[in-house]
Amino acid sequence: MRMLRALVGRPKKRQITSSEKDNQPKPSQSFVEGSSSPDFPDGVEVLHDCPDATVDICFVHGLTGDRITTWTAQGQYNPWPKTLLPSKLSKARILTYGYDAYVVRKSVPGSNRLIDHATNLLNDLTTDRVLHNAASRPIIFVTHSLGGLVCKKAILSSRNSPDAHLRNIFNCTRGVIFMGTPHKGS
């Protein structure tokens, strides 16, 4: 955590002007399009694209979170990785990954399984990196809570995959930042 703070510092809260409010889409409008469900935006979203990137940084949210609001400060419209990191890490492509992280919906237990989320992360991220000619680019994961477990399982699945293109995630992973991940259960 100290390394991340040293890298980006703490975001300062600022007031949003009325013209900024009018010109910026609300998160619910900007990232739900194309999602499989309006309840949660899933898959990979590029927060900052850099044509000559030397590293990908992928944020993976935790339990009951989503790929945008988990990383967005109260009163802000954009997530801090999108607003802060490009100025500090100019050669990084910033990604976020979303999945249905709700255990219970309307008093009905969810059927989501860790391995399913991990498989989707591995497949979606591999596809995105191939489409952006980034399959061999180093990648760093920043994870929170359940997202850390999803990420670990995806990396292990990548390592053990018989498919070379899926093994690239394992081979290119340079680090994982775990924040509040229950490695030994909750």
Ranges and model annotations:
Residues 61, 116-186:
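Serine-dependent carboxylesterase/thioesterase catalytic core
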Residues 66-68, 103-106, 149-151, 185-186:
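Short catalytic/ligand-binding loop motif for oxyanion handling, primarily in non-cytosolic enzymes
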Residues 69-75, 107-111, 153-157:
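Short coil/turn segments at secondary-structure boundaries
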Residues 87-104:
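Conserved alpha/beta-hydrolase
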